[in-house]
């Protein structure tokens, strides 16, 4: 598939990009970092921190719901917003539904909690992401409804038959 690069302007110029690993001064291979550290980065250096923190939460919900266990620090990144002099969460990329894996994140939710293993764990972490329980629950419902239409999207992309059956456990 040919995709439009999110780190380029319409006229081909570069938009500065760094991975979450770079932002946390990590080589990306260690497993000691947490999403709450990215919240801290956004609060400190973000151009629109609350919007991006809420978007990060949505992605954690999506990753959990599609069993994306490839959520390491090199698969999250930031683009520099020169107009607002700060970093923005980049568009999501490299999302991999994994039908045979446990629903467990590579990156920890908080420095104390460990990998994300359940809806309850995510919901308990919502305050770190500046979300009230009701807001977090509403986001969960919205993302779950979108994920529920995965078959329609997959068929539209040409998936059929056994491919749909094979991927179903990731979305169950």
Listing of model-derived features with the role each one plays in the protein:
Residues 1-73, 77-172:
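Anionic ligand-binding catalytic core segments
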């Amino acid at each position: 598939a040919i995709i439009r690069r999110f780190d380029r302007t319409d006229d081909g110029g570069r938009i500065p990009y760094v991975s979450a690993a770079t932002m946390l001064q990590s080589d990306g291979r260690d497993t000691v970092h947490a999403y709450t550290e990215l919240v801290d980065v956004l609060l400190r250096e973000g151009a629109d921190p609350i919007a991006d923190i809420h978007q990060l939460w949505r992605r954690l919900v999506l990753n959990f719901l599609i069993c994306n266990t490839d959520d390491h620090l090199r698969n999250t990144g930031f683009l520099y917003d020169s107009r607002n002099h700060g970093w923005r969460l980049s568009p999501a990329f490299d999302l991999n539904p994994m039908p045979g894996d446990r629903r467990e994140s590579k990156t920890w939710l908080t420095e104390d909690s460990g990998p994300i293993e359940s809806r309850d764990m995510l919901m308990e972490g919502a305050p770190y992401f500046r979300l009230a329980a009701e807001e977090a629950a509403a986001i969960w419902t919205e993302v779950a409804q979108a994920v529920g239409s995965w078959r329609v999207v997959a068929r539209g992309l040409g998936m059929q038959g056994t491919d749909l059956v094979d991927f179903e456990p990731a979305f169950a």
